Amino acid sequence: MILAILVGCVGTNTDVYHGYSKSGVISSFNVTALKSRHLEMVNALRLENGRSSLKYSSSLSAASKTHAFDIARQQRAWNYGSDASSAIDRAKIAGFEGLVLGENVSETYEGEYDVLNVWFKSKIGREIILDPTATDLGLSWYQDSTGKVWWVQMIGKS
């Protein structure tokens, strides 16, 4: 009986983007909720590893959005802008006054849970996410006409 009550309390989130094959267009979902879920997942991983929580940065997210669109246009998930800009350059232009510690990028048909899992399993991605000096996180994406999502996550220290 207790198990049934607990399961009822957990509920299900029907507003989760699980990837192109399951739900289609990411833009049909609440952008704020998706970014909040991502921040919560990152903070859970950080807390499990003895790190402090990050806060959402609108300037890092703006820089991430610009880069997501740019790498989609380039058809290449990498850390360089088509104008040869770096993550540091893009964050500065977007108004971030702190230090950019790292940027994770991905091109995939997967959702935010899966892409975070991939980043966390890679040595460099994990180091960026768990940087002990980090204080800020930005996330954005661009979904092209084929359904492919170009994700960009930036971690910084304000």
Language-model features and meaning:
Residues 16-17, 61-110:
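Short, surface-exposed glycine/acidic/tryptophan-bearing loops
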Residues 14-15, 153:
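Short, low-complexity, intrinsically disordered N-terminal segments
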Residues 9-12:
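N-terminal Sec signal peptide cleavage junction
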Residues 86-158:
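A well-ordered secondary-structure block
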Residues 1-3:
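Sec-dependent N-terminal signal peptides
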Residues 15-73:
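A short alpha-helix/helix-coil micro-patch that ends at or immediately precedes a cysteine
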